[in-house]
Amino acid sequence: MKFRILFFLLLINSYPFFGQIPINNLVGIESISNINSEFFEYNGYINKNKNFIFFNRSNDPNNVGGIKDQGDVWYSKKVFDNLWTSPENMLELNDQENNLLLGIENQNIIVFTNGEVNIYNITDAGTKLISNSFIKYYKSNSNILSGSISEDKKLIVLSADSYGSYGVEDLYVSKKLNDSTWSSLINLGSSINTSYQETYPYLSSDNSRVFFSSNGYDGYGGFDIFYSDRQDDSWKQWSQPINLGNKINSEGSENSFIYDSNSNIISFSSSKNSIGNSDLKFYYLNLDKNDLPSSDITNFSSIEDGQKIILNKVFFYQSSHELLNESFDQLDLIFNFLNENQNLTVFLEGHTDNIGNAKKNLELSGKRVQTVKKYLITKGINKKRIDGKGFGGERPLISNKSSSSNKLNRRVEIIFNKTM
């Protein structure tokens, strides 16, 4: 897996694409970038309490269907402050089909699989299927699909190669008829669909506007994100699609645009500057800079015994156990957490890239563990609470194909253990 630092401010000239909400700025949420990997992440949803993120990942060997699996649902849990757990596959609700994450609501996850709409309740006790419904006469000529459920949970918008397609993937809507049945797919028509691909539809909160990704309109890259307004209740007449602009779209490809009006969080997936296929990015949308979340949150979530965290902001110079200056903020965060939780011990795992001599890399990784250990001890943590081991380049997060990926492989992972 890959962990990338993301922290910058995007100034936007009040694009009106959220209806009546004027956009003044977007602020990157750096801590959540660690869910990304060398594969394809999309459909990123953060729960109401902002301590879980659920998303889709495709073509990961750890998917139920392996590297040919078009989509499994994964999750990551916020442990404390800016640290999130390594993503895990939600095996209990995935299979070898394309398991499309349509949305979340409270403790429920809504997943679409081969015409079925399944709602799962997620608790500490486990995952339970609480509702099963289906789209009438559902048909798709391929296993490639995307989409989402409306905020009122009465509509599903999908991208599929289905009835009356104008191209490859078109946009469709299905309306909820009762607790067990959804209407057959309604093609959104030629005013929005092209002979190319329209994908990843997402409805505004009032269901009057659809955001989607397409390579059928002029844009900045391969796929750009657009929006279009519904003109009537037929769902077949739409305004001319408008590009969201180069503050979101790039020379790469962007998709799976999502806006949570409750948390004011925007997410989308982009191939720009991604080490993997496409990475999820998260931003706070704020009407006033004074409303930005504080960076010194002190509410800690419970941590599980044996929980592993990748220190995604602790890096080393190549061929050295010297820490980069950017590393100290996160190490101080670890110190504060250990200081607040005296019942925890930690085991440090040191890793290098796999460039050069394997024996020297193994030795170097051990020295990196000692560097982190020494720093925490110097700050005041009892040395008996810290242990560790170096693994050299045996366990890369991602393939060592570039200098940026090499940097991510030169890392330390930390495992928390409870002593009582």
Where do the model's predicted regions map?
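Sec-dependent N-terminal signal peptides
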Residues: 4-14
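Periplasmic peptidoglycan-binding/tethering modules of Gram-negative envelope proteins
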Residues: 285-345, 419-420
